[in-house]
Amino acid sequence: MVKDELLALLDSLDANGGFTDEGFARFGELVERIRIESPWPEPTRTLHKVEGRWETVFAHFGGKVNAGKTRVHDSTLALQSWNRFPPAPIRVERICQEISRQGNAYNNVIDFSAPPGASRDGQAHGAIVVRGTFRDDPDNAQRFVVEFTRMELAPTRGTSEPDLRRALGLADDAPLVADMKPPKVSSDVIYLDDEIRINVGSVGGLYLLKRSGEQPFSI
């Protein structure tokens, strides 16, 4: 099965999430082949198969050098929040996507931790919620047209709001919500089954996500 070969190839990535030249070429071939095997080839017409919480297990942005960044990696709050919050150092622990027919929600949830010692009580944990809504494209049943509208910060895993603020260098009265008006983007679900889906974004990203058994955080 193409799906089994694709997942096995992803398991062979090196410690930094990188491909060999041969592996990257093979990855592209398998993605093209798996498109025609999708059990649910028109996702916007079978939304019950799309909604829920999905965890990103692989992403690349148009070239081998940008393929497969390790899921756990160092970043900044500004980078992950589209510059809506300050450039505090954080460690991205995972990125999930949560979709619901209720309100046409299309949210990205980034779980992160602040550096050890940044909080009075040790490491602080939080989530960045990028809230968006989707609509379908009448001419393309794979396409979700998405408009992201708001960015939120929330403490998680027992971290208090004051500790999260302290860890990120935020003032006590600094807002944890920021509205946004970015250009609309779209994402094509080119493969969908009960376990995985593959998305190709309008700005060139390709993402493989696995369905999570956890309850959504943002919905």
What are these regions, as identified by a protein language model?
Residues 2-219:
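Soluble ligand-binding/transfer domains with enclosed cavities or grooves
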